Structure formats: structure tokens, C-alpha cells
Amino acid sequence: MGKKRNKVSVIGAGFTGATTAFLTAQKELADVVLVDIPQLENPTKGKALDMLEASPVQGFDANITGTANYEDTAGSDIVVITAGIARKPGMSRDDLVATNEKIMRSVTKEVVKYSPDCIIIVLTNPVDAMTYAVYKESGFPKERVIGQSGILDTARFRTFVAQELNLSVKDITGFVLGGHGDDMVPLVRYSYAGGIPLETLLPKDRIDAIVERTRKGGGEIVNLLGNGSAYYAPAASLTEMVEAILKDQRRVLPTIAYLEGEYGYEGIYLGVPTIIGGNGLEQIIELELTETEKSQLDKSVESVKNVMKVLS
């Protein structure tokens, strides 16, 4: 018997889902199944075939399948959920939440049916609330249902700091806590350039400007694109989580995790520092927060709770 190959299913074959599928295959992390609704089955198959045909050129060995049939996802190690609608002009946030919650619940039923032992990573917005909806629908332990936003938010923060200091992004570390929105909390005290505290390298007004730009990072790209939202960086962030799990790397990554008293919050999904490894969420890391940071995080939690009130 040959060794079982890793299998990752990506639900939603839009820009983010397709890019995640391609990056996962390109890194030879797993065979990939890209899933979308029956009306989009042919375009989904087309994208998967196009990626597969890149493999001889890029030199990677991974099977990539496009489908509208969840049976093809059976036995997945990880399922990444990017499916959902984007907010349209004139659409209320509550409408968006209600619609995407329905999608999350129907997708999760299929995921649980065919991959009862998988780890689920959620990207669909509003991501904190959608991760909670998937957790409730799945019946999985909290370790196996996590959301992605903090890696992306932190990547934006690191990018802007690197640009400001004219340094390699590899040398910039940082952490963004809280919900994925305008109330996220970039922790400047825990941010470094080559091990040197950021606060010793940049004046407060420049740091404040970077923090503000990070909070508005998604909107900045939406405005520039004019149609659609970011997908390269979100897909790269998802792929980093997939790799950490499949290789059991025990990476310290900001992740949307279910809190049971950590940071003083109960029964809510929120972006916090975590250890991510072979079991999914291995551990939540509790940092000491200043009064200001804690009050900012409280505000972020209120924003998440307001969205969660709309959930059925």
C-alpha cells in the first residue's frame, strides 16, 4: 500500500479559492479539490485543468480536480471555505450575514458528511461570525474549526512597516488581534524589525499612520480594484495555515479561534495569537495587554458580537 496523499478541498472557486488551490498544489502540500455550485461546474473544472497544465512548467506534482460534487471531497484532511457572496451596493450588512450564514450551513453539512475528521478553515466574510456558524453547524471540536484574517491583517501591517523602513519584510514581525474589521488591534508593542522594537525605529505618528492603513487595508484594495476585493494575499494567508497543519509545524500564527474565557471573552470567535499544527488549533496564547489595548480589543469584540446577533 502506498502512503496516503494529503487532500485539501477548497469550497468556492472564485479568485481567492482558485488562488488558494493553485498555491497549495504548487507547494506540493496536497492533492486539491476545487468545488463550486452546479451552475459553475464547467468553469470550476476549467480552472482546475488550467492549473494542472501549469504543473509540468512549474515542476509540481499534485492532482487538481474541479467539481460541483461534494463526493469528490471525501476524506479531505483540510477543507477551506471561501464560498459566499460579496456585499453588493444597497445591501445591508444584516442581509449579507444572513445570506452567507445559509451558505455556510449548507456547505458545512456536506463537509461533515464526506470528511468527518477534517480541519475546517473559514475565510468567508464577515469571517468571525461565519466561523462561528460553521463551528455550530459542524459539531466539530473548536480545535478543528478556525478562521483566517489575522495572518492577512498582520501581513499588511508587516508590508507597510517594511516599506516605511526600507527593510526586508522577512525581518518584520507583528501581531494583529481582534475582529477582521476597522476595530482590529495591531499590537505595536509586540512588533519588531530584526528583533529591534518598532517603537525605537519609527516615531509615533508614522506608526499610527501604519496602524490606520492596516485597519483600512481591505478597503484600500477594494477601492483600487473598483470591482472585487483582495485575493492574492488572502490566498497566501490560507495556504500558510494549510501548510502549518499538514506539516505539523506548530507555527505561532494569529488565527480566529473559539474563546472560552481567554482574554476575558466567552463563546465567541476572535483573532488571537495561536499555535497551529497537525491537530489544527493546538493552543491559544494569552498576551499581557495594556489598558488601552484591552479597551481596543473590547471594542473589537463588541463589533463581532453585533454581527453575531444577526445569526439565526
Swiss-Prot record:
The keyword Oxidoreductase applies. It comes from the Bacteria. CDD domains: LDH-like_MDH (cd01339). Keywords: NAD, Oxidoreductase, Phosphoprotein, Tricarboxylic acid cycle. The modification Phosphoserine is found at S149. Its EC number is 1.1.1.37. Substrate binds at R87, R93, N125, R156. The active site is at H180. GO terms for biological process: lactate metabolic process; tricarboxylic acid cycle. It catalyses: (S)-malate + NAD(+) = oxaloacetate + NADH + H(+). NAD(+) binds at G12, A13, G14, F15, T16, G17, D36, N100, L123, T124, N125. InterPro entries: L-lactate/malate_DH, Lactate/malate_DH_C, Lactate/malate_DH_N, Lactate_DH/Glyco_Ohase_4_C, Malate_DH_type3, NAD(P)-bd_dom_sf. The keyword Lipid metabolism does not apply. GO terms for molecular function: L-lactate dehydrogenase activity; L-malate dehydrogenase (NAD+) activity. Catalyzes the reversible oxidation of malate to oxaloacetate. NCBIfam families: MalateDH_bact (TIGR01763), PRK06223.1 (NF004863). PANTHER family: L-2-HYDROXYCARBOXYLATE DEHYDROGENASE (NAD(P)(+)), L-LACTATE DEHYDROGENASE. Belongs to the LDH/MDH superfamily. MDH type 3 family. This is Malate dehydrogenase. It comes from Bacillus licheniformis (strain ATCC 14580 / DSM 13 / JCM 2505 / CCUG 7422 / NBRC 12200 / NCIMB 9375 / NCTC 10341 / NRRL NRS-1264 / Gibson 46). The gene is mdh.
